[in-house]
Amino acid sequence: MKPAFELAAFTVRDGDEAAMLAERPAMIEALRQAFPGLLAAWLTKRDDGSWLDVILWRTRAEAETAARHVSDVPEAKAWFGHIAESHGLQHVDVADQQLFIPTLGSASEQVTGP
């Protein structure tokens, strides 16, 4: 079984960015509880101001199952309310991996800033 990434591109409603970021940790934890195959999550902001959510799943099947049932998780459904426009959801299989740093930081070391 190969791990897979889920890539979700979107824009955020005007004025919702701070709330979206503040609510994300609880939303991701709720997803982790609902879908044990969730291994890691990164939220990235693109140069054009849009966002790309990058989720690492144990398997593509677990990613696809979660995508079908994500709206059953109340925290996720509420968090999606911050999304102005979806630019698509994609699942991609990891073909090769080179893991040099097992973690980029704990929850207490989350990246913050501009």
Task: Describe each region flagged by the PLM.
Residues 1, 22, 112-113:
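Short, low-complexity N-terminal intrinsically disordered segments enriched in polar/charged residues
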Residues 2-4, 35, 49:
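Residue-level preference for beta-strand/loop junctions
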Residues 3-11, 52:
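Active-site-flanking beta-strand signature of metal-NTP-handling nucleotidyl enzymes
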Residues 11-22:
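Short, surface-exposed ligand-recognition loops at beta-strand->loop->(often short) alpha-helix junctions
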Residues 14, 49-51, 58-63:
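Short, charged/polar surface micro-motifs in flexible loops or helix N-caps
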Residues 26-39, 56-93:
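An amphipathic, aromatic/His-enriched active-site/gating alpha helix that lines ligand/cofactor pockets
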Residues 44-46:
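Short beta-strand micro-motifs enriched in acidic
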Residues 83-114:
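Catalytic "initiation/cleavage/transfer" segments centered on a nucleophilic residue
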